[in-house]
């Protein structure tokens, strides 16, 4: 296949290009470096940085198969596990998302990092704020800092690293609302309330897919034939935000299945590959 890779930003790598710059995550850059090197060896791949495409541009591109991998963004309304609707008090206290911090927009003074994601991002951003001179309190409804990292045997090291950085850790505690003078915290078990004074809050909640382009293309499906388009597929974080490994697998899977016809129709839960099923038979 002849491939065109259009990147909306100035550099390739997606979220890895940003997250590799966070404390302790520089090694993750190898995920990006390896693939960029491999792509650079192939004459049939054209790369276009700084090329955010709209529906019209995609239709005019002239490619038969369109893979939309537009990623996701961190929610700014606090919706995650504790809050299924927007957190009360938004706008009363300066609030930041992980995207803000990775773009260089940092809080100052007393900062509460509210981690309702429970993977690695909350702990990493708490350390980042502490290194920037903030007085940091990490609040999480979980019983452990960066709870998911117990699966990778990193949780203890993360807790120790945060404690050594001067981060105050508050476990089993959520944030029920934002106030002008800080956050209203609540016990995950008793719902007892107290105020943690702060000048800003970093909301590490859930992520929302950047799928506007995909839905715009689907709405113009009647124009696909004239544009020479056979298939349009949404993959990676744009389809369902998840770990970097899942996004990497999604790209690999898309390429593997491109010749199978699976993208040309909705296969539902049908497997796109054959497998041998052993059963007992009467001789």
Can you say where each PLM-predicted feature lies in the sequence?
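SH3/SH3-like beta-barrel fold
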Residues: 183-187
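Rossmann-like dinucleotide/flavin-binding elements
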Residues: 1-12, 47-60, 66-150, 189-200, ...
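N-terminal Rossmann-like dinucleotide/flavin-binding domain of flavoprotein oxidoreductases
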Residues: 14-64, 149-176, 182
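Short polar/acidic secondary-structure junctions
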Residues: 175-176, 188-190
């Amino acid at each position: 296949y002849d491939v065109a890779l259009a990147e909306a930003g100035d550099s390739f790598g997606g979220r890895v290009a940003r997250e590799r710059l966070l404390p302790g995550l520089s090694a993750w850059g190898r995920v990006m470096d390896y693939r960029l090197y491999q792509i650079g060896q192939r004459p049939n791949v054209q790369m276009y940085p700084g090329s955010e495409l709209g529906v019209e541009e995609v239709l005019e591109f002239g490619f038969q198969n369109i893979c939309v991998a537009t990623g996701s963004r961190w929610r700014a309304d606090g919706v995650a596990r504790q809050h299924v609707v927007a957190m009360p008090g938004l706008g009363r206290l300066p609030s930041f998302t992980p995207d803000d911090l990775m773009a260089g927009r940092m809080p100052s003074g007393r900062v509460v990092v509210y981690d309702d994601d429970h993977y690695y991002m909350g702990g990493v951003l708490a350390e980042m704020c502490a290194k920037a001179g903030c007085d940091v309190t990490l609040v999480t409804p979980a019983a452990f800092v960066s709870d998911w990292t117990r699966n990778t045997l990193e949780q203890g090291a993360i807790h120790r690293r945060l404690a050594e950085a001067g981060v105050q850790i508050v476990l089993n505690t959520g944030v029920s609302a934002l106030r002008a003078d800080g956050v209203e915290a609540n016990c995950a078990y008793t719902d007892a309330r107290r105020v943690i004074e702060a000048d800003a809050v970093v909301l590490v909640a859930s992520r929302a897919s950047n799928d506007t382009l995909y839905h715009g293309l689907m709405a113009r499906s009647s124009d696909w034939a004239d544009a020479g388009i056979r298939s349009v597929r949404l993959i990676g974080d744009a389809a369902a935000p998840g770990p970097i490994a899942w996004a990497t697998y999604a790209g690999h899977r898309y390429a593997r299945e491109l010749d199978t016809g699976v993208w040309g129709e909705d296969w539902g839960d049908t497997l796109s590959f054959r497998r041998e099923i052993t059963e007992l038979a009467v001789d």
